Structure formats: C-alpha cells, structure tokens
Design a protein with these regions (language model features):
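Conserved N-terminal phosphate-binding loop of PLP-dependent enzymes in the Aspartate aminotransferase
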Residues: 2-395
Length: 395
C-alpha cells in the first residue's frame, strides 16, 4: 500500500465506494496537530477537524496513548459486560453536564434517535399514546436516518426518501408565539434544538428565545432536548453551548468532538428521565466501545476551564479578523464554530477550492464558509489562515 498513488485511491473510491460524498480533490496521508499532508507530501493547515471531530487535532499524544493501550487490551465486549472506560466516561459526562445518566451510541444520528425514543416513552408512560409529536426548528439538522431526517427542518434534505416518519413537526426558530401556539395542541412530548444551527449555516438562536422555550417546556411538561452533536465538548468555548444561555435541558445529545477522532455518540439524561428507559428498551452492539470511550476520556481530561477560556479567546480573535476581511458581509457562531457570509457574487465553495490550492482547508455550510478548526489551534495558525483567506478574497 505504500506505493499506492493518489490517482489509484481515487479510482478505487470511484469503483467501489457509494458515491454519496462531494469530496475535496485531496487524498490525505497523515496529520499532526493542526496540519495534514497528502500523498504527494503537500502540507495543509486544517480549519475543518474532520467536521468538528478532531477536537485535539491530529494524533494527540495522550489521546493516541490511551487508544492504543485500550485497543491492545480490550477492543470490544458488547454491552453484556461491564467495562471501565464507559463507566468512567459516563461519570465524567454526568459531572460536567449536571445531568444523571448516559447511553452510548456510535453517531449523532443514533444519539438523537435514542433521545427521541426516551421522550416518547416518558410521555407515553405519563400521558398515554396520543402525545408523541417531537417538535424541531426550521433550518435544523439532526441526522440522516429516516427518523432524524424527518426531524431535520430543511427541505433540501427531504427529497427522494418518502414516506417520512410521522410524529415530527417544525416550528420557526426565534418565534416564541408560533411555538406556544403549536404546544397548545397538547400532542407534543419534546422539542429538540441546536443552540447554534451548524448545517443550517452556523446560525445562533436568540438568548431570549431559548429562555422562552425553556419556560414553555416547563409550562406544558414538554421535554427540552438539546442537540450538542456539533456544538458540544468545548467547541463553543464552554463544555456545552447550552451552558452559555442558562438552560437546564432534560436530554443532551453528543458525538463528533467527544471521541477525538473515533466514532462515538451519546445521549445524557436529566433527573426527570433518568429512569425512563428500562431493560431492553434500547440497545447498541457497538455502543460504549472501550476504545472509543478511552479516546473520549482522553479528550475530556484535557478540556478544563483554562482550555475553554482559550477556545473562547481564539474564537473571538478569529471572528474579529474574519469580519475585517474584504467581501465579508457577516460573521456568526460561537467559540471555534464560525460561519462567514460573503457579499453577493462571492461563492463560499469557490473560496474553499482556492484556499486548498494555497494550503488551507475550510468547510462550507449552505452558502457560508464554515470554520471548525481543532480546538488546539494557536494564534500563529489563525493568522496564517486569515492571511490566505484574505489573499484569495482580494485576488
């Protein structure tokens, strides 16, 4: 395999992998910190972190040590046995969230599915079967399974896959009156929302709206589920984004940055629903995988108050620098989860392609440029990324 060329890998992909991804024209070989290299030895500064997954960058030494040690001793057991990594990880997640119990899955979509099941069972146990609707927000994204796609509030994803799962409805973001009117129908068991809508264009919800949502949830005994798949684990400058808005969710969902590069998802249950799921109500063969949990424990061990303060500082620095660039109309987001809207005529996808040619990797979200750098990115790397972006925008 060491003599394989980029073109050979691309051809194998074309021949044998389902063509569901619009890939960058790069074949990556290895990475370290905030840099990655392709098969030809070209170096790139990474502002994508695997779409917010590599929170500690590429091949962090402590993370790698924990993962290799666990893989060499106990890689998989199923959930018929107790394991140390999952137990310790669950305790840590309960402590940092203020919630009570954790169910481990393998992805954000799985975590959201589990949260939805929990909400419906809670409502069924308390009110009966006619109170099962889950509300989500217009412009939201919650996954690509049939149920989480049904929950997603973007028509662009609602093509070709009919019929969708019943029991979901969408309400406009930042419109409390519309939400209260919908809750008045008395058929809703939960609302699930992202504090910052990532795939929807890095759009932050209003503080007043979020406070109002929480109050309405209390009034109608509707569960508040916060999707922290992209915003969680330090991405926004606090461990979880909801902590910046004075919210107390009943359930949060996690994935992406939790594993530091390995697949893992989780939903964390608050006191009201901590005992809702009983034996055989939910399950996952690969959930709580010891290796993934060991990686997640290594990630959480590094995210302390000092680390989070640096994420916030670097995010503010990056947003300020981005706002000063030519052709930039607006900058949105929290911490190191940032969206850049360009003036009319400047396409984010074109900017990303030109930046790749100059050795810097960015993402898009709808029509915006999206930045999700490793949380360990330093000031010099931020300045380099801004310089390249400025050069491209001025060309």
């Amino acid at each position: 395999m060491t003599n394989t060329t980029s073109n050979e890998i691309k051809q194998l992909d074309s021949d044998y992998i389902a063509q569901t991804y619009g890939r960058f024209n790069l074949v990556l070989s290895h990475g370290k910190g905030c840099q990655v290299w392709d098969f030809e030895g070209n170096e790139y500064l990474d502002f994508t972190s695997g779409i917010g997954v590599n929170s500690l960058g590429w091949t962090d030494e402590d993370w790698l040590k924990a993962v290799v040690h666990q893989a060499s001793s106990l890689a998989h057991t199923s959930n018929l046995f107790f394991t140390e990594p999952s137990s310790r990880l669950a305790k840590k997640l309960a402590e940092v969230s203020g919630l009570k119990r954790v169910f481990f899955a393998n992805s954000g979509a799985e975590a959201n599915e589990g949260a939805i099941k929990t909400a419906r069972k809670y409502s069924h146990d308390k009110y009966g079967k006619d109170r099962a609707t889950v509300l989500t927000l217009v412009n939201s994204f919650h996954g690509r399974t049939i149920s989480t796609l049904s929950a997603t509030g973007q028509e662009v994803f609602h093509q070709h896959f009919f019929p969708f799962t019943k029991g979901f409805d969408h309400t406009p973001a930042n419109e409390l009156r519309a939400l209260e009117t919908r809750l008045g129908q008395k058929d809703v068991c939960a609302i699930i929302l992202e504090v910052v809508q990532g795939e929807g264009g890095v759009c932050s919800l209003d503080h007043e709206y979020l406070q109002g949502v929480q109050a309405l949830c209390h009034q109608y005994d509707v569960l508040l589920i916060i999707d922290e798949v992209q915003t969680g684990i330090g991405r926004t400058g606090t461990m979880f984004a909801y902590q910046q808005f004075g919210l107390t969710p009943d359930i949060i969902t996690l994935a992406k940055g939790l594993g530091g590069g390995l697949p893992i998802g989780a939903f964390v249950l608050g006191e009201k629903v901590q005992d809702t799921l009983g034996k055989s109500d939910h399950g996952s063969t690969f959930g709580a995988n010891p290796v993934s949990c060991a990686g997640a424990n290594a990630v959480l061990a590094k995210i302390d108050d000092t680390f989070l303060a640096e994420v916030k500082r670097k995010g503010e620095k990056l947003q300020k620098a981005l706002a000063a660039l030519p052709k930039v109309k607006s900058v949105s987001g929290l911490g190191l989860m940032i969206g850049v809207e360009f003036e009319e005529g400047t396409k984010a996808a074109d900017i990303v392609a030109k930046c790749i040619e100059k050795g810097v990797l960015f993402l898009t979200a709808k029509t915006k440029l999206r930045l999700l750098p490793p949380l360990i990115i330093n000031d010099e790397q931020i300045e380099k990324g801004i310089a390249v972006l400025k050069e491209v925008l001025e060309a």
